[in-house]
UniProtKB/Swiss-Prot annotation:
GO CC terms of this entry: cytosolic small ribosomal subunit
SUPFAM superfamilies, per the entry: S15/NS1 RNA-binding domain
Assembly with partners or alone: Part of the 30S ribosomal subunit. Forms a bridge to the 50S subunit in the 70S ribosome, contacting the 23S rRNA.
Gene from which this protein is expressed: rpsO
Pfam families reported for this sequence: Ribosomal_S15 (PF00312)
Protein name: Small ribosomal subunit protein uS15
PANTHER family: RIBOSOMAL PROTEIN S15, BACTERIAL AND ORGANELLAR, SMALL RIBOSOMAL SUBUNIT PROTEIN US15M
InterPro entries reported in the protein's UniProt record: Ribosomal_uS15, Ribosomal_uS15_bac-type, uS15_NS1_RNA-bd_sf
Residue span of region Disordered: 1-23
Length: 89
């Protein structure tokens, strides 16, 4: 489940740290979260799609590592990102 150009641009504009930012950890987490939610919806209807399930688990692991990085750099940025994306709790 890939993201379209417009959808990527909207995510970048929403989560960028500075005007020329396109690849910060916050932007990457936002893109992964969107892809994870799309793939989760796909897997609810296609239970036996095991390759997609494996890709989903890899994306979740990548997002977890990026969130750990953001948290190690700034607890404030981490909590703001979690609230903005409504990921935890």
């Amino acid at each position: 489940m890939s993201l379209g150009t417009e959808e990527k641009q909207n995510l970048i504009n929403t989560h960028q740290v500075h005007p020329t930012d396109t690849g910060s950890a916050e932007v990457q987490v936002a893109m992964l979260t969107t892809r994870i939610s799309k793939l989760s919806t796909h897997l609810q209807g296609n239970i036996h799609d095991f390759s997609s399930r494996q890709g989903l688990l890899k994306m979740i692991g990548q997002r977890k590592r990026l969130l750990g990085y953001v948290r190690s750099k700034s607890e404030k940025r981490y909590t703001e990102l979690i609230e903005k994306l409504a990921i935890r709790g």
